[in-house]
Amino acid sequence: MQQLCKGNVAVVKGALLAGCRAFYGYPITPASEIAEAAALFLPQVGATFLQAESEVAAINMVYGAAAAGVRVMTASSGPGLSLMQEGISYIAGAELPCVIVDVMRGGPGLGNIAPEQSDYFAMVKGGGHGNYRNIVLAPASVQEMSELTTLAFDLADKYRNPVIVLADGFVGQMMEKLDLTYREATPPEKLWAVKGTPETRKNLISSIFLEPDELEEHQRQMEAKYARARNEETRYEEYRTDDADVLLVGYGIVSRVLRSVVEEARRKGLRVGLFRPITLWPFPSNALSQAATRAGKVLVVELSNGQMVEDVRLAVNGKVSVEFYGRTGGNVPSVEEICAELTARAALTV
């Protein structure tokens, strides 16, 4: 079924297709429509929506529902996610599945409500305390806002871990075609949940391990599942990279601008390609390294002062030059702006 839909609303429709049965959150621009849509749609299928008194309360409600075996989610933006970080660390430490949507806005501090990509470090590098990882998915369209949210629930259950849908505010606020295909949600049986089973006692779920050896073993087990995710879950998209001399790298709304840059640059005689990471963690390092090595030059474009570029440089490992171009404050570089940047940089290397 095709419909015109806002990105934030598409998140909730994707969650419903995944069998989400609880949403706890607190409204914040530019993510508020997710809570509004959840309040409208979840009760219609017998699911729970609750607006908490704060983001701290919301993430701890998510912890409780996840421990009970419910497919549960929350959504927020910048400052709200900062308040949730302790709870996210607890959820990861207790190995509980949940989905968290971050519709990024400008920062630091209160910043503004305009879109940015400045939460990359906070979400991709963990954000909270301790040795844990978030699986992070980066949609670039309204369609992917729905599809990657559905996928997020499956990955959360597969790895018993928080999964972040990291969207810039442009993708959250834009409206475009959404093609929804009904699927029967089949969440796995959760024998580990606090309710246990008729044949077993109830389970105790916690993230505290008082004995050093117990905590170390717990962290080894967590690292083993993260290693499995690195091997099985990297996702990315390449566009016209086979003969490219310059490789553009961007995610979210930036990747859509860069696709147009590729076409415009090629009309001007520059062989340019695009690499779009879809999983920001696990980062598609091997595929990016191969594409970058073929090209010889890399330009990373972000709506930040340079965050993902650090992972790009780690992936390339000094094999080729990696340069950066960024805009902040809610400004998105135009196709003409990036093409001019490419032309200027190409002239400097002649």
Located regions from the model:
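Glycine-rich beta-alpha junction loops
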Residues: R105-G107, A167-M174, G252-V254, N305, ...
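Conserved thiamine diphosphate
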Residues: A114-D168
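Peripheral docking tails and interdomain loops at the edges
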Residues: E302-V350
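Generic long, charged, amphipathic alpha-helical segments
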Residues: L258-A291
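Thiamine diphosphate
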Residues: M1-G126, R133, S141, T328, ...
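Glycine-/acidic-rich phosphate or pyrophosphate-binding loops and their flanking alpha/beta elements
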Residues: K6-A10, E223-V246, R259
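Conformationally flexible catalytic loops at phosphate/diphosphate-handling active centers
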Residues: R160-E238
